[in-house]
Amino acid sequence: AYDTNRGLKQYGGLHTQADFDRIKAQIAAGNEKVVSAYNILKNAEYAQPTIQTYPVETIIRGGTTGQNYINAARGATMAYQNALRWKIEGNTSCAAAGIRILKAWANTCKLVSGDSNWALAAGLCGYEFAQAAELLRDYDGWGNNGFENFKKWMLTVWYPGCIHFLRGRNGTWENIGNQGGIRPGHYWSNWPLCNALAVISIGILCDDVFIYNQGMSFLKYDQVGTFRDPRTDDLILNDGCTEFWGNLIVTTSESELETGAYGKLGQMQESGRDGGHAAMALGLAVDIAH
C-alpha cells in the first residue's frame, strides 16, 4: 500500500502485529497445536540468544573452492528466529541476540560473489536478512545509528546484485543458445523469485517505495519475448521470465490459456523437476503474495 505523504504504509514484512497478537492469544488460551509448534521454535538451536554467528567479508556461492554462503544463511536464520521469539514472548535477550547477529554481518560483509550461483545467495540470504531486521526495527537496542547503518548495508551489498540479476539474468536474458532464442528466460523460477522477494523486502525495510515497486514490476509486467508451444505450431507469448505471475501460476487458476486436452494441471513452472525445488518456488511465491 502506498501513502503519498510518507511512502510505504508500514504493515511489516512477512508478519504483522495482528499475526503476533493472534499467536500470543492462542498460546495464552492453551491451544495445544499452537503451543506445540511454538515450543519447536523456542527449543530450536538457532533460536537461542547465546547462538554464535560467523560473518565473512565475502560470501561465496558456487565455484570449485571457498564456498561459505551457508554461514550467511545460518546467520540470517538465527537473527530471524530470535526476532520471532522476541515478538511472541517478549524475550529481550532474543531481540538483543538478533541485533547482535545482524550488526556483526553488516560490520563485516562487503560482497556476495562466486560463479553464477552467487545470485541464489543474494536472493535467498538477502531477503532473510531484510525480514529479520524488519521484525527488529522497533527494538531500542540497535545503538547509535545501528538500524540506519544496517539499512545502508542492505542497499549497498544486497540490493545491487539482486536487481542486476533480475535485469540481466547473468547475461542469459535472450537465451540465444537455446532453440535459436525462441525460448527466452534461462533461469527457472526459484532464481528470480528469491531475488524479486529480496528487492521487495529491502524496499519494505528501507521504506523505499521505488525499490518495492521495482521488485513488484518484474512479477506484474515483465515480458521478454515468445516461445514455441510444443503442442502446436504456433508461437505464443511468453508472459515474462519465470517469476512473472502469468507464466508462473497460469495452470493453477482459471485461464483461457488452459482449455485444451491438457486441462488445468495445477502446476507451477518448477513442478515436475523435483519436490524440493517445486516446494521452494511455491513458498517463495506465497511469501511474495503475503
Task: Say what each PLM segment does.
Residues A121, R183-C194, G203-D207, I211, ...:
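Short, contiguous, pocket-lining structural segments
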Residues I204-H290:
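Long, repeat-rich segments with strong aromatic
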Residues L136-Y139, I202, C206:
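Residue-level signature of the C-terminal ends
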Residues A1-G185, L193, L197, S217-K220, ...:
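Extracellular glycan-targeting catalytic surfaces
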